[in-house]
Amino acid sequence: MASKLETLKANLEAAFGGLLLNLSEAIGELTIVVKASDYLNVATRLRDDRSLGFEQCVDLCGVDYQTYAEGAYDGPRFAAVLHLLSVQNNWRLRLRVFAPDDEVPILPSVVEIWNSVNWYEREAFDLYGIVFEGHPDLRRILTDYGFIGHPFRKDFPVSGYVEMRYDPEEKRVVYQPVTIEPREITPRVIREDRYGGLKH
C-alpha cells in the first residue's frame, strides 16, 4: 500500500505532468515549482481537483534568493512560496513560483483562489517588492506609508536609510538620515573550562 506522500506525488504528476518544473521531497513534505505563466491554472486545479483538494492556503511568503547558496545560485531572484493544506485528504504541499523579472518582480494574485492570501500578498509586496497583479488592495501593510524600499531584500541596509523620532520643537514625528555609526561587533567567547563557574 502506498504512503500518503507517495499517493500525493502520483496525483500531482498525473494532474500536472510537464507543468511541474520541479517536484521534490524534504522532511516529509513535497515541494512543487511552477512557472509564473502556469501559476493560476496550477493553483486553481490544486484547489478544485478532488484527488488533490488543497482548499486552504495557510501561508504565503516572499523569498529573495540573491545570496542563496553563498552566491552560487544563478536563477531568478524573487519567489512566492505558498503552504497549502488539504483537510479532506490530510496532506500538505509547498508551492513555489519565481517572478520572471528580477528588476520588477510581478506575479499573478491568487486572492480569488484562496482569499486567505490577501494580507500575505500585501506583506510580500511590502517587504520584498513583489507586485501581485490583480490584488484588490495591494498597499503596504507593515512599514510606514512614506517608507522607501523593501526591508527584507538582501541588498537593503540593516540600519535602513532614515530614522524617525519625535521632535519636541515641531511637536511631531520627523524623518532624518540614519545616525547609527558602523561598528565592529566582537562575539563574547565562553571558555568551556570556566562555564557557569564549574571546573571540569
From Swiss-Prot:
It catalyses: a quinone + NADH + 5 H(+)(in) = a quinol + NAD(+) + 4 H(+)(out). InterPro entries: NADH_DH_suC, NADH_quin_OxRdtase_su_C/D-like, NADH_UbQ_OxRdtase_30kDa_su, NADH_UbQ_OxRdtase_CS. It is a peripheral membrane protein. Keywords: Cell inner membrane, Cell membrane, Membrane, NAD, Quinone, Translocase, Transport, Ubiquinone. It is found in: Cell inner membrane. PROSITE patterns: COMPLEX1_30K. Its main location: membrane. Pfam families: Complex1_30kDa. Coiled coil: none annotated. Its EC number is 7.1.1.-. One of its GO terms (molecular function) is quinone binding. One of its GO terms (cellular component) is plasma membrane. NDH-1 is composed of 14 different subunits. Subunits NuoB, C, D, E, F, and G constitute the peripheral sector of the complex. Belongs to the complex I 30 kDa subunit family. HAMAP family: NDH1_NuoC. NCBIfam families: NuoC_fam (TIGR01961), PRK06074.1-1 (NF004730). This is NADH-quinone oxidoreductase subunit C. It comes from Paraburkholderia phytofirmans (strain DSM 17436 / LMG 22146 / PsJN). The gene is nuoC.
